[in-house]
Amino acid sequence: MSHLYLQPMPRSYVKKEATKFFLGTNTEIILSSQCNSQDLESALLLQQQLHELIGFRLSVTKCFERNYSTPSIRFIKVDELEEEAYDLIIEETYIEIKATTSKGLFYGTQTLLQIIKNEGVELSGVEIKDCPYFRNRGFYHDVTRGKVPILETLKSLVDKLAHYKINQLQLYIEHSFAFTGFSEIWYDKDPLTAEEILLLDDYCQKRHVELVPSFALFGHLYEVLRSESYKHLCELDDESEFSFYDRMAHHTLDVSNEASLELVEKMMADVLPLFSSKKFNIGCDETFDLGKGKSHHLLNTLNDGELYVEFLNKIIQIAKNHDKDVLFWGDVVLRYEHL
């Protein structure tokens, strides 16, 4: 092939059309002596993917560099590259993936797999030098609308993200998670469980994808604020039938009720320990009803922007108490630049 067809395209590459490497049953996958258990995960992933692609399983081993056999695919740790960078070299008798970190080796593995999917068992020679342009490469996944995905479906999504070097998955949950003590909200929703989140988080770590929790803690808490236990915390009383518009446009917490903050804290305490990421997206968008109902009297001393920020800061502080770095949507605060 005269061009590389890769996503994303590497920063630089040099093709060597006259050079060919043949993937055969005698090809070994070799880890250098500096490689660790994370690098073994990359090697085993390559082994598994190649078995599915070409029909035979290559052996995996580890040795000192001077003992490399040929033909082989070599995972080599070096000192001089950036954190997520890698070099991929395809020569006639060997393939080398070089990186300073396990992330780099993993990304080099993904690039090699793309090349093999394009070319088959006879690979053209190439020298690739690559490093992602952006430190945060995220995908936001809302699992609250329609069918809740099962764990295997989410794992499949993680595999696809990792293949394209996406390193962050923000998982948006509301009633699609089985919060402890909230069964009236999720009992008929087939929600994700705490155990499934733990397993997904572990799966993400092995593929260098950061799993970031995200859920509503201020506005559009539709299922929570329509429940018998918590409907008294809704800014506007609502007994209407379900509609997609009302699901998003209403059901904001009553910030004048101290129990609203207690609810927020309870939800956080139930979910945050399940995620290894330090990041937490607290939502806090689309608080359309704020100050229009039960909390209206607070506007005697605060404007609606100040009312929003005051409760937002309380939520942020709870998250910080759990040692989390907070993200939130900016649709509301951007209307009040002075805040």
Where are these regions (language model features)?
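A generic local structural motif
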Residues: K15-E17, V126, M267-M268, R335-H338
